[in-house]
A protein has these predicted regions:
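Extended, compositionally simple hydrophobic/Ser/Thr-rich segments
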Residues: 44-45, 52-64, 103, 110-113, ...
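Conserved positions at the start
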Residues: 81-83, 146
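Short acidic/polar N-terminal linker immediately downstream of export determinants
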Residues: 2-81, 92-114, 223-227
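ATP/nucleoside-binding phosphotransfer catalytic cores, i.e., glycine-rich phosphate-binding loops
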Residues: 89
Length: 227
C-alpha cells in the first residue's frame, strides 16, 4: 500500500470510529427507559368535556362517534394507563404519553370517544383515528407520519393537510368543498360535490369522487385522480 493510500485508509478509519463514538454517545444519553406493557389489559373511563377536535400523538387506535355526549374510555395494559395522557387544550382533546415517558406495548391501545360535534382530527405518528356519524360544518384533518384517519358522514367543508406517508380515507364523508395540501407520499380519498383545491409536493396521491370544480398544483410525481 502506498503512503498516500495508507493515509486515506487511516482517515476513513478515523471517520468511522468517530461516527461510532457519536452513535454510542447518543444511545447512552437517551432520556429515560421504556416501560414494558404487562400484557394485562384494563379499561378506564376518564372525565372529559369542552372539546370538538381530537389529537393523537404516538400509537393507538381512536374510535370516535359524534353523539349528544362527551366521553372517553381507554383500553390499555394496566401498568401503562398512568402514563397515557388525555388533556383538553384549546377545544382539543389531546391523547398521548407523559413527557419523558416511553412505552413498549404488547397489546393495542384503544380510545373510544364520543363528541357533540366533530371539527378536527389530528394524528402525529403511526396511530389511527376513525370517526362515524359525522355531521359538521367544517372538518379539519391534520396528519404527520405514517398514521391513518377514516371519516364517514357529512361535512360542508374539509381542510386536509398531510405530511409523510399517512392515509386519509374520506370517501365515505360527503362534502361540498375540500382543500388538500400533501407533502410526502401520503394518500387521500374524498368525496366532493362543488369545489376541490389540491396542492401536492412529492409523490402523494389524491383520489376523489363527485364532479367538483378542480384547481390543482403538483410538484413532483404526485397525482390527482377521479374515481
Amino acid at each position: 500500500m502506498t503512503g498516500r493510500a495508507a493515509q486515506a485508509a487511516a482517515r476513513r478509519t478515523a471517520v468511522a470510529l468517530g461516527l461510532l463514538v457519536v452513535l454510542a454517545g447518543c444511545s447512552v444519553n437517551l432520556p429515560g427507559t421504556s416501560t414494558q406493557g404487562s400484557g394485562a389489559v384494563r379499561t378506564e373511563t376518564r372525565s372529559v368535556s369542552g372539546f370538538s377536535a381530537i389529537q393523537l400523538a404516538g400509537n393507538g387506535d381512536v374510535q370516535i362517534e359524534q353523539s349528544g355526549t362527551e366521553s372517553l374510555t381507554i383500553s390499555a395494559e394496566e401498568n401503562l394507563l398512568p402514563l397515557l395522557t388525555s388533556d383538553v387544550v384549546n377545544n382539543e382533546l389531546r391523547l398521548g404519553v407523559k413527557d419523558g415517558a416511553r412505552i413498549d406495548t404488547t397489546q393495542p391501545i384503544t380510545y373510544k370517544v364520543t363528541v357533540r360535534e366533530l371539527t378536527g382530527m389530528d394524528v402525529a405518528g403511526n396511530g389511527s383515528q376513525t370517526a362515524t356519524k359525522v355531521k359538521t360544518g367544517s372538518l379539519r384533518i391534520r396528519m404527520a407520519g405514517t398514521g391513518s384517519i377514516t371519516a364517514t358522514g357529512t361535512a360542508d367543508a374539509q381542510d386536509i393537510q398531510m405530511a409523510g406517508s399517512g392515509t386519509y380515507r374520506g370517501s365515505g364523508l360527503t362534502s361540498k368543498t375540500a382543500t388538500v395540501k400533501s407533502a410526502g407520499t401520503g394518500n387521500a380519498e374524498l368525496a366532493v360535490s362543488d369545489s376541490l383545491d389540491v396542492n401536492i409536493i412529492g409523490n402523494g396521491t389524491v383520489t376523489y369522487t363527485g364532479s367538483p370544480q378542480v384547481n390543482q398544483s403538483i410538484i413532483g410525481s404526485g397525482s390527482l385522480q377521479k374515481k
